């Protein structure tokens, strides 16, 4: 656009200036005339009450859809099994519960947003206003203006007159948080005493984790390290990982004279001792053993336990000794547990004390 195309009243005013001086507009803060706001054009909802009613019903329908989607979210959470899968093209086989929760919660939130946008675009006041910049300091006049603007906004939103919109909006906003409340159920149930007990009980055979065969005393050589689990626990079992995380054992054979802890000696069989394989720091499986020092080392954070002295902690961040399992030999000559651990295995937790 050339200067000939600009209306004369919008051009900067001419001003006398010495030769070579920089050109400066007549008004540095506003070099062009303010064209002002265009005239307001009423919408169809502003002049036709029937159109306004249709918009009101549309907004209410969206808010109602949000409420129904929230109810569907809760129903899906309760009714759909966590292991159920469903084929969705092109996603393939996915969790039916996750798909249902995601879709219903997405619809619930989208419907609230869409309803609010449609309400603002069709029923709220759409007149443009200009507000001059003002100091940041909130003077009494400014605070009074804020209150007045709030009242004016409430009036222009027609929320007092459009009770159907108000009620359905409040209903949708009230129900949506229930989705998060329902999800709190996944924080429970409380573990109760599950962390205090394992699969070990009196008479349970010690099974070699590598060969899946019951252990005899002759299978454990002096200075060797053997990993064991309770009989009857199979890798394909649904709860295998949860159970082995508590019941895994380290079987070590020491010279009885080298055992320093009296209880450790009493709970052993001919120098064979059984300790929990789970580190008491953060639950890593212990797998390193020093034959000469009888020290077991956790590879995660280097917690070190003296297996000849009650598996006490001699180095590292672990908080307490490894629990020992009392063992013996049954009539058939196999190593067996004489009960469960006397204390919870693994890391400490609040209820452990």
From Swiss-Prot:
Read off the InterPro entries from this record.
QcrA_N, Rieske_2Fe-2S, Rieske_2Fe-2S_sf, Rieske_Fe-S_prot
Binding-site list for [2Fe-2S] cluster:
279, 281, 298, 301
Q: Which molecular function GO terms apply here?
A: 2 iron, 2 sulfur cluster binding; metal ion binding; monooxygenase activity; oxidoreductase activity; oxidoreductase activity, acting on paired donors, with incorporation or reduction of molecular oxygen
Cellular compartments annotated: Cell membrane
Ranges of compositional bias, category Basic and acidic residues = 40-51
Q: How does it sit in the membrane?
A: Multi-pass membrane protein
Record-annotated Rieske domain positions:
246-336
> Does the keyword Transmembrane feature in the UniProt annotation?
yes
List required co-factors: [2Fe-2S] cluster
Disulfide bridge map = 284-300
Q: Copy out the cofactor comment.
A: Binds 1 [2Fe-2S] cluster per subunit.
What are the start and end residues of every segment in region (Disordered)?
1-51
Q: Name one Pfam family in it.
A: Rieske
Q: Which keywords accompany this UniProt record?
A: 2Fe-2S, Cell membrane, Disulfide bond, Electron transport, Iron, Iron-sulfur, Membrane, Metal-binding, Oxidoreductase, Respiratory chain, Transmembrane, Transmembrane helix, Transport
Regions that span the bilayer: 60-80, 99-119, 164-184
Q: Does NADP count among this protein's keywords? A: no
Provide the primary localization.
membrane
Coiled-coil stretches are none
Judging by the UniProt lineage, the source's domain of life is Bacteria
Give the record's family classification: Belongs to the Rieske iron-sulfur protein family.
Binding partners and assembly: The cytochrome bc1 complex is composed of a cytochrome b (QcrB), the Rieske iron-sulfur protein (QcrA) and a diheme cytochrome c (QcrC) subunit.
Record protein name field: Cytochrome bc1 complex Rieske iron-sulfur subunit
Q: Which source organism does the UniProt entry give?
A: Streptomyces coelicolor (strain ATCC BAA-471 / A3(2) / M145)
